[in-house]
């Protein structure tokens, strides 16, 4: 079958000339499809004597297999070339500097709150919370702050109406806790508070943590020891500390706590005192049986002292150049 050999040669030549998979598939259809040149050779078998047909059929099948193998080889070659091209295009230049991943960090005030919660948690204090929109009873009356007290003035407090306000302290959390729990009580109450003030050391919203212990035989000595240990832990040094007599309506006696700054001047850091008997009576606790101490501190102020920040407003301006210093 000399004509068969020519067809195989033509098919192989067409396969080599094919430049892509689509052209290669066209060659396959032309020679091996249902009406392909090699497939049609099978129809010539009927013109041969019966005894020659098997041998002739075998020759045609061998020719078809030879062309199919050439197709497979050429297709594999094309796919390999395409893969190499893609890999070359996707190759990573290891000499290029890597892209630095910017890790986030906690806000410095959040760091301070977590540090305080950790310290007092190790002393057995639980963390309590309460509403930021408060009523005048929990924010003032129950804390022994009478109606004529300056803290109730419009210029200091954000009032919604005659009874509702944005809390000026987290002390209301202490009142609610004492109303719902029986002594012994040992809590801290971190949260946002609001006062109508704005300057280098004050903002209308700031963070405060207040602490409370109510139990039998609680003394001012317990208060001093607790706060001394806290300040030593927070500032990570054995700082000189003084308790200065002060006045708060909800504690008696009351004191403000100062620490000695690096400039040799005293710096106020918090207020504290023994829970006033009237406050205990307001929540149904007998002051003849139980006593307690309370303290309160501004988170931004402590953070300023710890990190040497001079303007409290920097904590709320969201300047990444400032915040990245505290990662």
From Swiss-Prot:
Molecular function GO terms recorded? ATP binding; magnesium ion binding; phenylalanine-tRNA ligase activity; tRNA binding
Gene encoding the protein: pheS
How the cofactor binds, per note?
Binds 2 magnesium ions per tetramer.
Cystine pairings recorded for this chain: none
For this protein, what is the EC number? 6.1.1.20
Organism's domain of life?
Bacteria
Q: What is an annotated GO biological process for this record, any one?
A: phenylalanyl-tRNA aminoacylation
Q: What is the lineage of its organism?
A: Bacteria, Pseudomonadati, Pseudomonadota, Gammaproteobacteria, Enterobacterales
Q: Which family, according to UniProt?
A: Belongs to the class-II aminoacyl-tRNA synthetase family. Phe-tRNA synthetase alpha subunit type 1 subfamily.
- Could you tell me the keywords of this UniProt record? Aminoacyl-tRNA synthetase, ATP-binding, Cytoplasm, Ligase, Magnesium, Metal-binding, Nucleotide-binding, Protein biosynthesis
Residues given in the record as Mg(2+) binding sites:
252
Q: Which InterPro entries match?
A: aa-tRNA-synth_II, aa-tRNA-synth_II/BPL/LPL, Phe-tRNA-synth_IIc_asu, Phe-tRNA_ligase_II_N, Phe_tRNA_ligase_alpha1_bac, Phenylalanyl-tRNA_Synthase, tRNA-bd_arm
In Swiss-Prot or TrEMBL terms, this protein is called: Phenylalanine--tRNA ligase alpha subunit
């Amino acid at each position: 079958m000399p004509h068969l050999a020519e067809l195989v040669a033509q098919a192989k030549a067409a396969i080599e000339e094919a430049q892509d998979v689509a052209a290669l598939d066209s060659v396959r259809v032309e020679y091996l499809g249902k009406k392909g040149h090699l497939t049609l050779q099978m129809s010539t078998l009927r013109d041969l004597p019966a005894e020659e047909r098997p041998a002739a059929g075998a020759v045609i099948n061998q020719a078809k297999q030879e062309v199919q193998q050439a197709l497979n080889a050429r297709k594999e070659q094309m796919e390999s070339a395409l893969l190499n091209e893609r890999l070359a295009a996707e190759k990573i230049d290891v000499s290029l500097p890597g892209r630095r991943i910017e890790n986030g960090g906690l806000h410095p005030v959040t760091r301070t709150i977590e540090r305080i919660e950790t310290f007092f948690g190790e002393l057995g204090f639980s963390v309590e919370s309460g509403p930021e929109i408060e009523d005048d009873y929990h924010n003032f009356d129950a804390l022994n702050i009478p109606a004529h007290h300056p803290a109730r003035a419009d210029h200091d407090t954000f009032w919604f109406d005659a009874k509702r306000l944005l809390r000026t302290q987290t002390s209301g959390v202490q009142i609610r806790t004492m109303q719902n729990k029986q002594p012994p009580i040992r809590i801290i109450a971190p949260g946002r508070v609001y006062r109508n003030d704005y300057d280098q050391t004050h903002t209308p919203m700031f963070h405060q943590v207040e602490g409370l212990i109510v139990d039998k035989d609680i003394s001012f000595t317990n208060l001093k020891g607790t706060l001394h240990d806290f300040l030593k832990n927070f500032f990570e040094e054995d700082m000189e500390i003084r308790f200065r007599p002060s006045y708060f309506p909800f504690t008696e006696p009351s004191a403000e706590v100062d620490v000695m700054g690096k400039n040799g001047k005293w710096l106020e850091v918090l207020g504290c005192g023994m829970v006033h008997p009237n406050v205990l009576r307001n929540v149904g606790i007998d002051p003849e049986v139980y006593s307690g101490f309370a303290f309160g501190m501004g988170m931004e102020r402590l953070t300023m002292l710890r990190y040497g920040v001079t303007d409290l407003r920097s904590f709320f301006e969201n300047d990444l150049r400032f915040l990245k210093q505290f990662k």
